[in-house]
């Protein structure tokens, strides 16, 4: 350029060695100078030139510089460092059909899915896209296919989504310390410029969402895609190949989200939440109301529950049980009721439920606020004519679940006739909870139901490894509740 020559730094260093070597030869040819001070100085200059070729400026030697005063790059300078020959050209290099971007959390993705920006996907899948356009006769030539991609974004997006269903991508995060640092995912087209990643696969990559970047590669050949689907798919790599420990564990944003779903607001603030105090017939009505923004996530609501429920007595409030007082089993005379239980349990009458009817004094007079039932059979008159105008009777159960107490029955007596009625036939279970806790329980239930399917898909058939996975998940849940209790206290 402009009559100037560009010379490599190595050529300058080799040139200096050649010049000094020729100078030393002249001294060696003259016997009078073979042992002189000038010849020893020439030997030293040659040695310094060779040292500068290997590592410029080593051991206090005057470094070689160009006309601008810049240090010349020696052999060691060319090999070492991030821009060196090994790291830039051998250990890592720029390849076709690859990209790089920042990762962000994608909570709505499946475990084996990732979100690829549309701008990046157009470049990565360009050979598949152009081939599809030409096969479907949407364009005649390569140039016209490229023009169609630029001018018809709606058609291109539709074709791109169909192509991405059968073409996986490989995600990698440096440094790749083990083989699970390179996994296959099914791509989904997303807006923006960031790659969406499921938070559960972060431990395998040792990644987080504070600005980490990941590389994307597209396997081109059929054999490479088949290997990615079979061996490298994220949902097929649940356990660490080195230790057998599970890699799919909740962390970071997921733990924070679980805590937010199950947190308890202060009583004075929970009453102000939208929808607090509402009653729902089942869980589906709660989810429907929440999706329609009719209730707040932390609103205290009452839900009718059928089935087995468990609560931790030191954390959750007791369950509320409602026994309907219908005319089928209760008459105008006193009824004698027997509770048969396999273990001691206790029922407490809710006095506040009768305050509007002025029945607190009557309940106290009839010795009704507390009914202790021990093992075996205990008879106690708990109903009178005075209470038959009620629609139901509310009681608290201090055990996990009144409906699931073994062999629990109520015996209704009318004269000499007794009707044995199972307690679940008479009771309706109402729970005081929040929509957030319902969502959390549904998520945990779905995860537990799908856990055997995930284990069956893995190649680990030993029961020991399966038990380690189950125990690790249970331990993680226990640790979460311990942290939650510590935060609440």
Swiss-Prot record:
In plastids the minimal PEP RNA polymerase catalytic core is composed of four subunits: alpha, beta, beta', and beta''. When a (nuclear-encoded) sigma factor is associated with the core the holoenzyme is formed, which can initiate transcription. GO terms for cellular component: chloroplast; DNA-directed RNA polymerase complex; mitochondrion. One of its GO terms (molecular function) is DNA binding. In C.reinhardtii the gene for this protein is split in two. Mg(2+) binds at residues 208, 210, 212. It comes from the Eukaryota. Belongs to the RNA polymerase beta' chain family. RpoC1 subfamily. Binds 1 Mg(2+) ion per subunit. The keyword NAD does not apply. It catalyses: RNA(n) + a ribonucleoside 5'-triphosphate = RNA(n+1) + diphosphate. Keywords: Chloroplast, DNA-directed RNA polymerase, Magnesium, Metal-binding, Nucleotidyltransferase, Plastid, Transcription, Transferase. It is found in: Plastid, Chloroplast. One of its GO terms (biological process) is DNA-templated transcription. DNA-dependent RNA polymerase catalyzes the transcription of DNA into RNA using the four ribonucleoside triphosphates as substrates. Its EC number is 2.7.7.6. InterPro entries: DNA-dir_RpoC_beta_prime (IPR045867), RNA_pol_asu (IPR000722), RNA_pol_N (IPR006592), RNA_pol_Rpb1_1 (IPR007080), RNA_pol_Rpb1_3 (IPR007066), RNA_pol_Rpb1_3_sf (IPR042102). Its cofactor is Mg(2+). This is DNA-directed RNA polymerase subunit beta' C-terminal section.
């Amino acid at each position: 350029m402009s009559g100037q020559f560009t010379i490599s730094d190595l050529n300058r260093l080799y040139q200096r060695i050649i010049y000094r070597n020729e100078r030393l030869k002249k001294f060696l040819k003259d016997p009078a100078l073979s042992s002189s001070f000038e010849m020893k100085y020439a030997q030293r200059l040659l040695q310094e030139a060779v040292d500068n070729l290997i590592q410029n400026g080593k051991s206090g030697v005057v470094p070689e510089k160009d006309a601008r005063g810049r240090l010349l790059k020696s052999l060691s300078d060319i090999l070492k460092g991030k821009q060196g020959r090994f790291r830039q050209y051998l250990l890592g290099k720029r390849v076709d059909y690859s990209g790089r971007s920042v990762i962000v959390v994608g909570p709505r993705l499946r475990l084996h899915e990732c979100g690829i920006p549309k701008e990046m996907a157009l470049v990565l899948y360009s050979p598949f896209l152009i081939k599809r356009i030409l096969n479907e006769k949407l364009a005649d030539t390569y140039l016209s296919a490229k023009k169609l991609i630029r001018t018809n974004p709606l058609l291109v997006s539709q074709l791109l989504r169909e192509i991405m269903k059968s073409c996986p991508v490989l995600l990698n995060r440096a440094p790749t310390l083990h083989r699970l640092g390179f996994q296959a995912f099914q791509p989904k087209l997303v807006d923006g410029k960031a790659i969406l990643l499921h938070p559960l696969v972060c431990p395998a990559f040792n990644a987080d969402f504070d600005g980490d970047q990941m590389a994307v590669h597209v396997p081109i050949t059929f054999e490479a895609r088949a290997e990615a689907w079979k061996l490298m798919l994220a949902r097929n790599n649940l356990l660490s190949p080195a230790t057998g420990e599970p890699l799919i564990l909740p962390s970071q944003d997921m733990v924070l989200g679980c805590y937010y779903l199950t947190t308890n607001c202060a009583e004075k603030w929970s009453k102000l939440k939208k929808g607090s105090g509402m009653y729902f017939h089942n869980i589906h009505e709660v989810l429907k109301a929440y999706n329609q923004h009719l209730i707040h996530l932390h609103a205290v609501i009452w839900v009718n529950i059928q089935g087995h429920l468990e609560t931790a007595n030191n954390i959750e409030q007791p369950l509320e049980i409602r026994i309907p007082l219908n005319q089928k089993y209760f008459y105008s005379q006193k009824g004698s009721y027997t509770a048969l239980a396999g273990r001691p349990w206790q029922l407490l009458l809710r006095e506040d439920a009768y305050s509007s009817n002025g029945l607190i004094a009557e309940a106290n007079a009839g010795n009704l606020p507390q009914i202790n039932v021990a093992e075996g059979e205990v008879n106690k008159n708990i109903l009178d004519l005075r209470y038959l105008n009620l629609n139901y009777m509310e009681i608290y159960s201090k055990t996990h679940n009144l409906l699931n107490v073994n062999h629990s029955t109520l015996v209704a007596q009318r004269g000499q006739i007794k009707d044995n009625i199972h307690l679940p036939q008479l009771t309706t279970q109402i729970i005081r909870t929040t929509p957030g806790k319902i969502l959390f329980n549904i998520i945990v239930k779905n995860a537990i139901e799908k856990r055997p399917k995930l284990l069956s898909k893995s190649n680990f058939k030993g029961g020991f490894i399966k038990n380690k996975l189950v125990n690790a998940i249970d331990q993680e849940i226990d640790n979460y509740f311990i942290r939650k209790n510590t935060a609440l206290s």
